[in-house]
UniProtKB/Swiss-Prot annotation:
EC number: 2.7.11.1, 2.7.10.2
Post-translational modification (record): Mainly autophosphorylated on serine/threonine residues. Also autophosphorylated on Tyr-198.
Primary location: cytoplasm
Gene name linked to the record: Stk16
Origin species: Rattus norvegicus
Catalysed reaction, written as an equation: L-seryl-[protein] + ATP = O-phospho-L-seryl-[protein] + ADP + H(+); L-threonyl-[protein] + ATP = O-phospho-L-threonyl-[protein] + ADP + H(+); L-tyrosyl-[protein] + ATP = O-phospho-L-tyrosyl-[protein] + ADP + H(+)
Enzymatic class: transferase
Modification Phosphotyrosine occurs at: 198
PROSITE patterns: PROTEIN_KINASE_DOM (PS50011), PROTEIN_KINASE_ST (PS00108)
Function: Membrane-associated protein kinase that phosphorylates on serine and threonine residues. In vitro substrates include DRG1, ENO1 and EIF4EBP1. Also autophosphorylates. May be involved in secretory vesicle trafficking or intracellular signaling. May have a role in regulating stromal-epithelial interactions that occur during ductal morphogenesis in the mammary gland. May be involved in TGF-beta signaling. Able to autophosphorylate on Tyr residue; it is however unclear whether it has tyrosine-protein kinase toward other proteins.
Membrane topology annotation: Lipid-anchor
InterPro entries per record: Kinase-like_dom_sf, Prot_kinase_dom, Ser/Thr-specific_kinases, Ser/Thr_kinase_AS
Name of the featured protein: Serine/threonine-protein kinase 16
Binding site for ATP: 26-34, 49
Length: 305
């Protein structure tokens, strides 16, 4: 693990013997901050995520997030460039050096279009959805689930390709729940780590004897697809009005009619938003359906889907 050193007078930091210049703050939330930095060795921009670690458990969770990144070398999953632990007296900061995406997140794009009175077209949605699915497929193939998929956790590359980020909530894909104590512990964990308006129904009220699997991500993916289609998540307004999301997700989702969307896309969304997780499709099934729906490349014959 690299060592970090702050040279505040020059606004630079050193990670793994490379110097980075602080440019500006990008954002903050909870106990973490994200800064834009420039690598003085290569002139490239990076996002430096700094996690405040008040306890040993915080350090372990930050290390685990770094370990999750290192599991993957995939175009649709955010790459970790470097990881360092910085000591400041009795406190520590975990630093994750990540690629910088100037286009921001999928949510930024949805909001930008909405401000213009527009939405993503189906021909734009389908390749995005395919890329997100491929990222999830890679995560699930290694026996993990993302558990906090949402538009703000999906970056957009220069060519518009989706890249999954924020792997701090990832855990094992298949969880065998055996008893009320374990069920309550998992439910409490989900309340803290899984965004409420994108959280699968089975995580709101975990049964004493059940199996929670990676299809929680498929539900969240359905919420992301809904947001791409309609400009907001299906339960965003429920949460904003102070109504019960836990109650709302127990009912079948009503999908608005729109001439912008094919029946095939609507059926795909409906399958993802199946309340019973055992009836929800796995990612490989969705991938095969999605690949058949992809818009043709420029110059190819187009058919209505």
């Amino acid at each position: 693990m690299g060592h970090a050193l702050c040279v505040c007078s020059r606004g630079t930091v050193i990670i793994d013997n490379k110097r980075y210049l602080f440019v500006q703050k990008l954002g903050e939330g909870g106990f973490s901050y994200v800064d834009l930095v420039e690598g003085l060795h290569d002139g490239h921009f990076y996002a430096l995520k700094r996690i405040l670690c008040h306890e040993q458990q915080d350090q372990e969770e930050a290390q685990r997030e770094a370990d999750m990144h290192r599991l993957f070398q995939h175009p649709n999953i955010l790459r970790l460039m470097a990881y360092s632990l910085k000591e400041r007296g009795a406190k520590h900061e975990a630093w994750l050096l990540l690629p910088f995406f100037k286009r921001g997140t999928l949510w930024n794009e949805i909001e930008r279009l909405k401000d213009q009175g527009n939405f993503l077209t189906e021909d734009q949605i389908l390749p995005l959805l395919l890329g997100i699915c491929r990222g999830l497929e890679a995560i699930h193939a290694k026996g993990y689930a993302h558990r906090d998929l949402k538009p703000t956790n999906i970056l957009l590359g220069d060519e518009g390709q989706p890249v999954l980020m924020d792997l701090g909530s990832m855990n094992q894909a298949c969880i065998q729940v055996e008893g009320s104590r374990q069920a309550l512990a998992l439910q409490d964990w989900a309340a803290q780590r899984c965004t409420i308006s994108y959280r699968a129904p089975e995580l709101f009220s975990v049964q004493s004897h059940c199996v929670i699997d990676e299809r929680t991500d498929v539900w969240s993916l359905g919420c992301v697809l809904y947001a791409m289609m309609f400009g907001e998540g299906p339960y965003d307004m429920v949460f904003q009005k102070g109504d019960s999301v836990a109650l709302a997700v127990q009912n079948d989702l009503s999908i608005p009619q729109s001439p912008r969307h094919s029946s095939a896309l609507r059926q795909l969304l409906a399958s993802m938003m199946t309340v019973d997780p055992q009836q929800r499709p796995h990612i490989p099934v969705l991938l095969s359906q999605l690949e058949a729906l992809q818009p043709p490349a420029p110059g190819q014959h187009t058919t209505q889907i």
